[in-house]
From Swiss-Prot:
Residues 57-91 are annotated as: Coil 1A. GO terms for molecular function: structural molecule activity. Keywords: Coiled coil, Intermediate filament, Keratin. Residues 92-102 are annotated as: Linker 1. Residues 103-203 are annotated as: Coil 1B. Residues 364-404 are annotated as: Tail. There are two types of hair/microfibrillar keratin, I (acidic) and II (neutral to basic). The keyword Coiled coil applies. The gene is KRT33A. This is Keratin, type I cuticular Ha3-I. It comes from the Eukaryota. It holds the Pfam family Filament. It comes from Homo sapiens. GO terms for biological process: epithelial cell differentiation; intermediate filament organization. Residues 204-219 are annotated as: Linker 12.
Amino acid sequence: MSYSCGLPSLSCRTSCSSRPCVPPSCHGCTLPGACNIPANVSNCNWFCEGSFNGSEKETMQFLNDRLASYLEKVRQLERDNAELENLIRERSQQQEPLVCASYQSYFKTIEELQQKILCSKSENARLVVQIDNAKLASDDFRTKYETELSLRQLVESDINGLRRILDELTLCRSDLEAQVESLKEELLCLKQNHEQEVNTLRCQLGDRLNVEVDAAPTVDLNQVLNETRSQYEALVETNRREVEQWFATQTEELNKQVVSSSEQLQSYQAEIIELRRTVNALEIELQAQHNLRDSLENTLTESEARYSSQLSQVQRLITNVESQLAEIRSDLERQNQEYQVLLDVRARLECEINTYRSLLESEDCKLPSNPCATTNACDKSTGPCISNPCGLRARCGPCNTFGY
């Protein structure tokens, strides 16, 4: 791009007339891509004497091109920055309410699940306590059952012993009855023998009554026999009474023992029936407690499985949300880094613009206000000066580009 400058032609001094005013190296360059631009143009000490030489025109043209490209790049970067800011703003406006709403719902769901888990834990603890109480009650019932079973066995053994005693007493009673019968038969036999002997003696005495003997008074045999008979009868009666009394006493005692044994047997049978009923009721209750424990354990297992599945689902949701948050954070960090890079580029461009501006200002200040005072300053190789160098000079294109 060529600029038509209204400035008069300028030429360098004799010390720099044979070479362009460009430093041998770009050590003064501080901006990227500007190494071909002189960092300090004032080293050439150039002033207006007539017209620019070729190298100075090329340098100014190059500076104007670079400045225009940098300004265009700054505008493009500003547009890109504005687009990125709008995109970030739209993205944040689009995602912020959704994320907040989803987080609130997740927090509410998590709180509800935590409350349910706490309720389940308390219910589980209560069920465990009930199971422990049921186990203790079942152990107590088992102990009572074993105690009652041992008592039942003892009572049955006592009943068997009493039955054996009753059998022995029955045998003894039958023996005593047999003895009484035998004594009665013996008594009848004795009576019959006595009658036979009496009759025999009477017959013998009846045959001897005709004999008369003068002797001492004889003994009355009938009286003796009667006395003997009365004595035997009294003895037999006494023995019979004693035997009957002994038999009655033994029978009464045996009856009392049988009655007491039967009463005890009935009471024991009633106790056994009651114990059987109690044992059956305890067995039924124990079976019910076992069924209740099994049902509670199944319910607990199902609840744990259900809540574990719900908790895993919530964990997956939380993981997805955290991954989305991580992606959003990474996107924000990346955009922030890009924004910082753009800000750095903008700052460097502004610094470069300020540097070019200061260079141009310094070069404008170094231009002499009356170059005709030094008429011998022109070199022969650069051509003669303009006849009227002190005329008014207008700003060139690059100066207008900076806004002066």
